[in-house]
Amino acid sequence: MKTIMVIGAGQMGGGIAQVAAQAGYSVILNDIKEEFVNRGFGIIDKNLSRSIEKGKLKAEEKDLILGRITKSISLQDAVSADLVIEAAIENMGIKAQVFSQLDVICPEHTILSTNTSSLPITEIAAFTKRPDRVIGMHFMNPVPVMKLVEVIRGLATSDEVYKTIEDLSLKMGKTPVEVNDAPGFVANRVLIPMINEAVYTLYEGIASVEAIDNVMKLGMNHPMGPLALGDLIGLDTVLSIMEVLHEGLGDKYRPCPLLRKYVKAGWLGRKSGRGFYKYDA
């Protein structure tokens, strides 16, 4: 394993590219527009500069890490990748298009992985002729800080591919946890319904935003309340994952009407300046 292509230069993709480059791999950072790639590269640059300020990294190490990252706006560049990690938006149609193209472009040995937080790996793998070499790698946000990677086998994922990705995750400084393919996997099957239930608690007038978050912080020792966490994740993302859970697992996972209303209003959390809390632009 020498070269890794990361598709999607946003918050997740940029973070994955950073930890891969820090682990010594050659990285191709890909997105559909040059401005997106440059923005992602700039965030990696800032993250590494912050590490230097904190004494966790030397200036010459930063230069070496950035030197391992190549910018790309063409999927054709995947022809030189040993592993592709797709970190595009959570949309099955887009993932289907990307994986079917990658299947044609990439050499036979290339492993195709997705950072999806909730979509079925088996279904994504079916868009390729190599389902045994398709696997889920669900990183947590922010990627450079969070240790967990959920490694999700599709129905056909081979043991050899799983072992390769497990070893790679360890080399990236992560802790891989094996998870079977089911809606939301483990992380979002547990976390997102908790946020949704907190929204229901607000919707039903049981307590205020601050009160709900304080109960979970002070009573359950959570570092952040569920409504503040929803704002951090993005309420559109929370709703999207709840829709996947609802479709796959039934009415128990129905999204709260208030969550739908906030998303329709454009109140998406921190990224839009308003969610359950207000934020400075």
For every predicted segment, state its role.
Residues K2, A23-Y25, K163, L170-D181, ...:
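NAD(P)-dependent Rossmann-like dehydrogenase/reductase catalytic/cofactor-binding core
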